[in-house]
Regions:
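Cysteine-centered loop/knuckle micro-motif
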Residues: 17-21
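Short beta-strand scaffold segments in enzyme catalytic cores
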Residues: 27-31
Length: 190
């Protein structure tokens, strides 16, 4: 029997994204221009840090304070402040806007439970931990989120080039017709 499962990660048939054994794949376009014999690359600044997103999504266990601290350490000062002064519903709504897809709705209640417990505080091995204490102990002072090349995940059965152009256009606001594609080069992998 023929399988109609298509993986949005590796682009192969036979399995779905959540069962893919390949590393998570993002596809993008690296745009550059030559200016006075110097190459200049177009990069974008993320709206939110990866640490902030993973923290709000509840992608940690409450007994792993070291990992929670590492998420806090890669957040901006403003993000840390928001965690202390806003409730979960506002933070979640600001993170996703009106684009909360079904894929994130399932983790919202679990993430909220963790957030509320962390804000109130709890004991691990007779030591009290809460969000305020963890943030106070953070030594990082990031002013802005990470910068990177515009990229994202492919849609169902989308080819790499079309995905890269779509993501580039969505994240930069430029029309994809404003660039020339260089062909016959190997893709960049990090």
């Amino acid at each position: 029997m023929r399988s109609f499962n298509f993986c949005n990660n590796c682009g192969k048939n036979g399995h779905l994204y959540q069962y893919c054994n390949d590393p998570i794949t993002s596809v993008g376009v690296i745009a550059y221009k030559k200016d006075d014999k110097e190459l200049k690359y177009l990069m974008i600044c993320r709206k939110d840090t990866l640490g902030y997103i993973d923290f709000l999504r509840g992608r940690y266990t409450l007994n792993n304070i070291e990992y929670i601290s590492s998420l806090i350490d890669i957040m901006t000062n403003d993000e840390k402040k928001l965690l202390l002064i806003q409730d979960f519903e506002n933070l979640w709504s600001e993170l996703w806007g009106s684009n909360v897809g079904i894929q994130y709705r399932g983790e919202e209640s679990s993430a909220k439970e963790k957030f509320v417990k962390l804000k109130k505080g709890y004991f691990i091995d007779n030591i009290f931990y809460n969000l305020e204490k963890i943030i106070k102990n953070s030594i990082s002072c990031w002013i802005e989120p990470e910068w990177g090349f515009p990229k994202g995940r492919r849609n169902y059965q989308e080819k790499d080039l079309f995905c890269g152009l779509r993501e580039w256009s969505e994240e930069t606001g430029y029309d994809e017709s404003s660039i020339n594609i260089i062909t016959n080069i190997l893709p960049y992998e990090e």
